[in-house]
Amino acid sequence: MQSQTLLADTPLQSPYVEKQDFRDAMARLGSAVNIITTDGPAGRAGFTASAVCSVTDTPPTLLVCLNRSASVYSVFKQNQTLCVNTLAAEHESLSNLFGGKTPMELRFSAARWSTLATGSPILHGAVVSFDCQIGQIVSVGTHDIFFCQALALTRNDDSHGLAYFDRRYHSLLKQ
């Protein structure tokens, strides 16, 4: 483990760590793999994300981070709804489709989908899907943080999970 200690009288050259050092460190932060979907007046869209987490259970709220320069950004912002589909181990190839430049029609044609309360696509076989309404948007740096209230959910308790760690996929086996 590397560490660095700065003494109080040590002048800082920059208030932040280097961008690549930060990215390399974040690659060591394992997380679930999710496909975030929406459908509504602005159209249907989806992308792969690991920047998702629980905020509170009262009301049930998650956060999803999305780069404002992403091609799908305006669709999500205008629709104001989304579904967080947490992927099962067998969804690795689907994650790659939704994480690249594949046209939306091809992304969605690669799996089976349904809908719940908001009309956002729910992935069949996902470990869990949170069907949400976007309640608040906060901008930080290059990204917007969508705070999303869960209106409905589905669970698949028999699935193995899919995680991303050290820039690779890993299956999480249910015990």
UniProtKB/Swiss-Prot annotation:
Record GO terms (molecular function): FMN binding; FMN reductase (NADH) activity; FMN reductase [NAD(P)H] activity; riboflavin reductase (NADPH) activity
Presence of keyword Flavoprotein: yes
Keyword flag Phosphoprotein: no
EC number from the UniProt entry: 1.5.1.42
UniProt-listed SUPFAM superfamilies: FMN-binding split barrel (SSF50475)
GO biological process: nitrogen utilization; uracil catabolic process
InterPro entries: Flavin_Rdtase-like_dom, NADH-dep_flavin_reductase, RutF, Split_barrel_FMN-bd
UniProt keywords, alphabetically: Flavoprotein, FMN, NAD, Oxidoreductase
Enzyme class, spelled out: oxidoreductase
Reactions catalysed: FMNH2 + NAD(+) = FMN + NADH + 2 H(+)
Assigned protein family: Belongs to the non-flavoprotein flavin reductase family. RutF subfamily.
NCBIfam families recorded: RutF
Role description: Catalyzes the reduction of FMN to FMNH2 which is used to reduce pyrimidine by RutA via the Rut pathway.
HAMAP family: RutF
Name by which UniProt lists this protein: FMN reductase (NADH) RutF
Taxonomic path: Bacteria, Pseudomonadati, Pseudomonadota, Gammaproteobacteria, Enterobacterales
Gene: rutF
